[in-house]
Curated annotation (Swiss-Prot):
It catalyses: 2 Fe(III)-[cytochrome cL] + a primary alcohol = 2 Fe(II)-[cytochrome cL] + an aldehyde + 2 H(+). This is Methanol dehydrogenase [cytochrome c] subunit 1. Belongs to the bacterial PQQ dehydrogenase family. Catalyzes the oxidation of primary alcohols including methanol. GO terms for cellular component: membrane; outer membrane-bounded periplasmic space. Keywords: Calcium, Disulfide bond, Metal-binding, Methanol utilization, Oxidoreductase, Periplasm, PQQ, Signal. Binds 1 PQQ group per subunit. PQQ is inserted between disulfide Cys-135-Cys-136 and the indole ring of Trp-275. Binds 1 Ca(2+) ion per subunit. GO terms for molecular function: alcohol dehydrogenase (cytochrome c(L)) activity; calcium ion binding. Its main location: periplasm. The active site is at 335 (proton acceptor). It holds the Pfam family PQQ. The keyword Metal-binding applies. The keyword Signal applies. It comes from Paracoccus denitrificans.
């Protein structure tokens, strides 16, 4: 099926790279999933969000390191031709870079031998109504790659704001299949980066701010046929709960709670969408993700714990069966949508036992670490001592001990709630440095006032029920009045090894490298590199626009590059993007980022750096006009 008209402009060595991968695996496992794992092991590639299934956003490359990072210079750049927020990161496989954009969700394949040359582009025709029901700008978080097999060539997958998932030929850009995953008539859109496991491509859903009931769906990579769909709320059979669901931790809750923790049919419009990042452990065959906030935001309208919104899930990829779910914020009152990054590591716990861990910095201001084989809660630490809605998380029960002063009930206008609805962490993809055993966290340092109100549900319209005022916080601490932080966190000890303040939220995330560097980006348009041991700032560069994507690195022809998608927008940028002035507009974000327009403006693209700016274009003959070429 081909509803688009991609423009093929050349060939690359992508097919050769895949063929080489197959050759390497002839005496080893030969499934496409194993090929993807092997491709991810090569640090020259960046084949998926998070770089590999561990989602550590970590590179073993050391060519760029503490000693020479000051020599980084722009090597080449590419403009997407699209405004609005550019989230996520490009993919690199062999000699190609694949780039996505926010709406209209154009996909580009670029030739790394002649950087920036467009080999093909696939620009869909979408229902423009999708723009009117998008919550917080018309963003998209990335692409997924499947390496192909002896029947089907390699594929690139993208999601579209209008609710479709699309499979494209990675060599030509031709659309292979397209399926409708979400119904924009009820406000359900798609902004998530697809995720490939085995012969499946997984996608979540968006739209909790419009009362959309959340779900994750698995499609056959070759045909687009739906294999399974699992909801976050409702009857157990629709949640795909395994027979032994939460058996190791029955205190988390087990059966029938997707109905019993809601009043009446409120679960049908109860949110729990998942538009964030996934991780996967092939050894236990579980993938991990978070379900988001319940709907509406006004907690008075939905009594109960509202399971299974706000949960960390461990599901079997093949069947979709949930082995465990841990609800972090029962009966969420603050829009602490729990869809943030899941990073996998193997570390010794405090008793010296080696554990397979999952670490998740949540919007509610807590960093959770679980045993990813069974869901055991290992630790739950505050990201910052200003987190005040919760006093502590009890490790034996998993429950938060709340401070009622910062609740959002109808008879109480709560003030100085920390964090704000944006969370102390949001969509940024953070990183884990396995050498130093620390997580590099990008933080939003924003608090809020909250005033709830009642409203009816109307399909396809916003279903929030609260007016928010946000500001850098806490207001009483002038020396910590910046809106962002970068921190190095030890999940075993609970310590922050170092932390640095930023003017604006570190919305885009971090990348750690074996060169002893932590790269990250800022809303006012900087990409920075800090010493991973000390936090000292070693290098920075001002980009053409603010950044809400996250850094990546790759190697081509023996040279390491660092790349970043830039383009301000997303929730923190809606005031700038849509020219809003009311501080409560943009669900409260306009007030928090009122100064952003003093530092950056819109514009989308990719900037690539190398030592001394070296690239294929260091040879001035590369890319020059060749007599006889078509014009």
């Amino acid at each position: 099926m081909n509803r688009n008209t991609p423009k093929a402009r050349g060939a690359s060595s992508l097919a050769m790279a895949v063929a080489m991968g197959l050759a390497v695996l002839t005496t080893a496992p030969a499934t496409a999933n194993d090929q993807l794992v092997e491709l991810a092991k090569d640090p020259a590639n960046w084949v998926m969000t998070g770089r590999d299934y561990n989602a550590q956003n970590y590179s073993e490359m050391t060519d760029i390191n503490k000693e020479n990072v000051k020599q980084l210079r722009p090597a080449w750049s590419f403009s997407t031709g699209v405004l609005h927020g550019h989230e996520g990161t490009p993919l690199v496989v062999g000699d190609r870079m694949f780039i996505h954009t926010p709406f209209p969700n154009t996909t580009f394949a670029l030739d790394l031998n002649e950087p920036g040359k467009i080999l093909w582009q696939n620009k869909p025709k979408q229902n423009p109504t999708a723009r009117t029901v998008a919550c917080c700008d018309v963003v998209n978080r990335g692409l997924a790659y499947w390496p192909g097999d002896d029947q089907v060539k390699p594929l690139i997958f993208r999601t579209q704001l209008d609710g479709h998932i699309v499979a494209m030929d990675a060599e030509t850009g031709e659309t292979r299949w397209i399926m409708e995953n979400s119904d924009i008539k009820v406000g359900s859109t798609l902004t998530i980066a697809p995720y490939v496991i085995k012969d499946l491509v997984l996608v979540g859903s968006s739209g909790a701010e419009l009362g959309v009931r959340g779900y994750v769906t698995a499609y056959d990579v070759k045909s687009g046929e739906m294999r399974w769909r699992a909801f976050a709320t409702g009857p157990d059979e629709e949640l795909l709960l395994a027979e032994d669901f939460n058996a190791p931790n029955p205190h988390y809750g087990q059966k029938n709670l997707g109905l019993e923790t809601w009043e009446g049919d409120a679960w049908k419009i109860g949110g729990g969408t998942n538009w964030g990042w996934y991780a996967y452990d092939p050894e236990v065959d579980l993938f991990y993700y978070g379900s988001g906030n319940p709907a509406p935001w006004n907690e008075t309208m939905r009594p109960g714990d509202n399971k299974w919104t706000m949960a960390i899930w461990g599901r079997e990829a093949t069947t979709g069966e949930a082995k465990f779910a841990y609800q972090k914020t029962p009966h969420d009152e603050w829009d602490y949508a729990g869809v943030n990054v899941m990073m996998l590591s193997e570390q010794e716990d405090k008793q010296g036992q080696m554990r397979k861990l999952l670490t998740h910095p949540d919007r509610n201001g807590i960093v959770y670490t679980l045993d990813r084989t069974n869901g055991d809660l290992i630790s739950a630490d505050k990201m910052d001592d200003t987190v005040n809605w919760v006093k502590e998380v009890q490790l034996d029960t998993g429950l938060p001990v709340r401070d009622p002063e910062f609740g959002t009930r109808m008879d109480h206008k709560a003030r100085d709630i920390c964090p704000s609805a944006m969370g102390y962490h949001n969509q940024g993809h953070d990183s884990y440095d396995p050498e130093r055993k620390v997580f590099m966290l990008g933080i939003n340092h924003i608090c809020m006032d909250w005033e709830p109100f009642m409203l009816p549900y109307r399909a396809g319209q916003f279903f929030v029920g609260a007016t928010l005022t946000m500001y850098p916080g806490p207001k009483a601490t002038a020396e910590r009045a910046g809106a962002g932080q970068i921190k190095a966190y030890d999940a075993i000890s609970g310590e922050m090894k170092w932390e640095k303040m930023e003017r604006f939220s570190v919305w885009g995330g971090t990348m750690a490298t074996a060169g002893g560097l932590t790269f990250y980006v800022t809303l006012d348009g900087f990409i920075k590199a800090r010493d991973s041991d000390t936090g000292d700032l070693l290098w920075k560069f001002k980009l053409p626009s603010g950044v809400i994507g996250h850094p990546m690195t790759y190697k081509h022809d023996g040279r390491q590059y660092v790349a970043i998608m830039y383009g301000v927008g997303g929730w923190p940028g809606v005031g700038l993007v849509f020219d809003l002035a009311d501080p409560t507009a943009g669900l409260g974000s306009v007030g928090a980022f009122k100064r952003l327009q003093e530092f950056t403006q819109m514009g989308g693209g990719v900037m690539v750096f190398s030592l001394d700016g070296e690239s294929p274009y260091s040879d001035p003959n590369v890319g020059e006009y060749a007599p006889g070429e078509p014009t």
